A protein has these predicted regions:
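Surface/interface-facing alpha-helical segments and adjacent flexible terminal/loop regions used
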Residues: 2-239
Length: 239
């Protein structure tokens, strides 16, 4: 995979103090966990009901809390997402808008799947935009990671283990358990998993649709936030 550059430092605008997952306070830990959980939800695809937090922009709160620490590109990314939210009148309207974009980008379109949600599809591409087969080495490695932690996918999940949302749920597990148990090994794995495993393929995933999708920018923007969060975690230095 192509080398993905991690930013050298993440500085607190109020004090120029380096931030990393090792130094986050409880409030920012909670915001990061909530942000990762929300991103996982988005890439599963939204349900027909229960989207009032998106309609009202409430879901942006953890991302707003993380902005001084993570840094987003473009900097006004949250304002653009907020503008999308306010352009709809009810939950059904915003659901239809996002569902159509989700299917068009990640499931099927006239010209095929624009950006598959599986890490295996971005390994050993023979040509730009060409997908590698499903259930490749990334899927096998994710299965091994789950087994090594005594985890398993629920019976209701019928996706390969390298689906983006599943990888985000695994990252959530590493962070939450690493912080709550004070487990240095899990925190270290969260850093390497975000920066070395997830970020390279998620950047390729983002590149697939960033210049193509013009009708709905929601997933362009949330994927930009995801990349920023992965860079932040992956660049964390041990104290």
């Amino acid at each position: 995979m192509d080398e993905v550059r991690l930013s050298d430092t993440h500085l607190n605008r109020q004090g120029d103090r380096m931030h990393s997952i090792y130094s986050l306070d409880k409030t920012n830990q909670a915001a990061l966990l909530e942000g990762v959980a929300l991103l996982s939800r988005f890439y599963w695809g939204l349900a027909a009901e229960g989207n009032r937090d998106i309609l009202q922009g409430i879901y942006l709160r953890p991302f707003e809390a993380l902005k001084p620490i993570v840094g987003y590109e473009p900097p006004d990314i949250l304002d653009e997402l907020r503008a999308i939210n306010t352009s709809f009148l009810d939950e059904d309207e915003i659901f239809q808008y996002l569902e159509q974009a989700y299917v068009r980008l990640f499931i099927n379109s006239r010209d095929g799947i624009t950006a598959p949600l599986y890490a295996s599809c971005y390994v050993a591409e023979s040509a730009p935009g060409e997908n590698a087969p499903l259930m490749g080495p990334p899927a096998a490695l994710m299965k091994e990671r789950f087994q090594s932690k005594g985890l398993s996918l629920g019976d209701h999940i019928h996706e390969p283990p390298d689906h983006l949302s599943i990888e985000l749920e695994y990252l959530y597990f590493l962070l939450e358990r690493g912080w709550s148990d004070g487990d240095a090994a899990l925190k270290d794995e969260a850093v390497s998993f975000a920066g070395q495993i997830m970020l390279p393929w998620v950047v390729r995933f983002q590149e697939r649709f960033v210049a193509i999708e013009t009708e709905c920018r929601f997933y362009q923007l949330t994927t930009a936030i995801l990349c920023a969060i992965l860079r932040f975690i992956g660049a964390s230095d041990k104290p």
